[in-house]
């Protein structure tokens, strides 16, 4: 944007150029609603350091794809705090000239962690109240709906514990109660994570697969609410496609990135490139 400024009494015209901020975080709400309507899913990839963040942003820009950068509370602590993460990501968006939509999202947040991320400048948060009785999950989620709306952020909530381990929290991979999903969805959240037999980490050989019966029942009761599939690593492609057909608009991936990073690092060192 350009504007003319007049130097008082001299008759000289000074042209001032103001650079508008072109590279900035957005909420996940709009990108997931577009994904829902377009019958595709947006990838959520957890970041644990600068290298992961750079690789994910580069790939998203090359593919012209929106992306959600997920941060667990453990990763946030490792990177010295959520404000450090926000500063790093905002700086990289600008320096790398990232033009695709990018959301910075707290993954499996506690109530206290959600408040810290709101204060730090995240554009989206997930409150994981799945380990609480449904009444307490509802109460805390309701409070966060109000706060996130005031700050123009998007909010994900969870019903039914996702299996495996996430930041030291172990879930058994239960299937959520569709009626409880509706209770949480009706509070005004933007997207919903529900346990449908999915787990974090590697899937065991005896894994029974996703419960599409549960997913279909949840979708029927929550309407056009974008749904989230956690534990995306290792789920067969045909199951992924069917989940998207039934309303999944966001798929979380972390384990696959960890395995790839570890393998590449090990290979680099073994080849003596250090």
Each language-model region and where it sits:
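Alpha/beta enzyme core
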Residues: 28-32, 50-74, 84-99, 109-223, ...
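Active-site proximal loops enriched in glycine and acidic residues that flank catalytic Cys/His/Asp
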Residues: 196, 231-233, 255
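C-terminal alpha-helical cap/extension of soluble enzyme domains
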Residues: 235-274
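N-terminal amphipathic alpha-helix/helix-capping segment at the start of soluble metabolic enzymes
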Residues: 21-43, 90
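Glycine-rich beta-to-alpha transition loops that act as phosphate-gripper elements at the mouths
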Residues: 47, 104-110, 226-237
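Ser/Thr/Pro/Gly-rich low-complexity, intrinsically disordered segments
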Residues: 2-6
């Amino acid at each position: 944007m350009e504007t003319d400024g007049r130097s008082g009494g001299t008759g000289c015209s000074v042209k001032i150029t103001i650079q508008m901020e072109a590279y900035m975080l957005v909420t996940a709400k709009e990108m997931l609603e577009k994904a829902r309507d377009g019958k595709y899913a947006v990838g959520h990839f957890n970041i644990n350091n600068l290298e992961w963040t750079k690789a994910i942003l580069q790939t998203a820009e090359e593919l012209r794809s929106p992306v959600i950068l997920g941060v667990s509370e453990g990763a946030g602590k490792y990177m010295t705090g959520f404000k450090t993460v926000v500063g790093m990501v905002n700086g990289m968006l600008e320096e790398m000239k990232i033009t695709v939509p990018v959301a910075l999202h707290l993954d499996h947040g506690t109530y206290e962690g959600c408040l810290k991320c709101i204060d730090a400048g995240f554009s989206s948060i997930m409150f994981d109240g799945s380990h609480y009785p449904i009444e307490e999950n509802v109460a805390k989620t309701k409070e966060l709906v109000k706060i996130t709306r005031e700050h123009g952020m998007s909010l994900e909530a969870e019903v039914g514990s996702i299996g495996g381990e996430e930041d030291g929290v172990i879930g058994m991979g239960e299937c959520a109660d569709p009626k409880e999903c509706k209770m949480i969805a009706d509070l005004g959240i933007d997207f919903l994570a529900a346990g449908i037999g999915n787990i974090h980490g590697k899937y065991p050989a005896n894994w029974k697969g996703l419960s599409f019966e549960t997913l279909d029942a949840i979708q029927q009761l929550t309407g056009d609410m974008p749904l989230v599939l956690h534990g995306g690593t290792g789920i067969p492609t045909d199951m992924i496609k069917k989940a998207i057909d039934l309303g999944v608009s966001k798929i979380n991936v972390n384990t696959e990135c960890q395995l790839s990073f570890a393998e590449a690092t090990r290979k680099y060192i073994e080849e003596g490139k250090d």
